């Protein structure tokens, strides 16, 4: 159970990071960050 929960947490965090990266890369002040 703990392993599945950890995996779900990582997946959720990854999704949030992806959304943040998209909004950041669309922002002229932020799009120069690594990963854009």
From Swiss-Prot:
Pfam families: Toxin_8
Cell compartment(s), UniProt: Secreted
Entry keyword Nucleus: no
Keywords in alphabetical order: Acetylcholine receptor inhibiting toxin, Disulfide bond, Ion channel impairing toxin, Neurotoxin, Postsynaptic neurotoxin, Secreted, Toxin
Entry comment describing in which tissues the protein is expressed: Expressed by the venom duct.
Superkingdom of origin: Eukaryota
GO molecular function: acetylcholine receptor inhibitor activity; ion channel regulator activity; toxin activity
Gene Ontology annotations for the cellular component aspect, listed alphabetically: extracellular region; host cell postsynaptic membrane
Positions of disulphide bridges: 24-30, 25-36
UniProt propeptide residues: 1-21
Main location: secreted
Job of this protein: Alpha-conotoxins act on postsynaptic membranes, they bind to the nicotinic acetylcholine receptors (nAChR) and thus inhibit them.
Family: Belongs to the conotoxin A superfamily.
Domain description: The cysteine framework is I (CC-C-C). Alpha4/5 pattern.
Name of the molecule in the record: Alpha-conotoxin-like Pu1.3
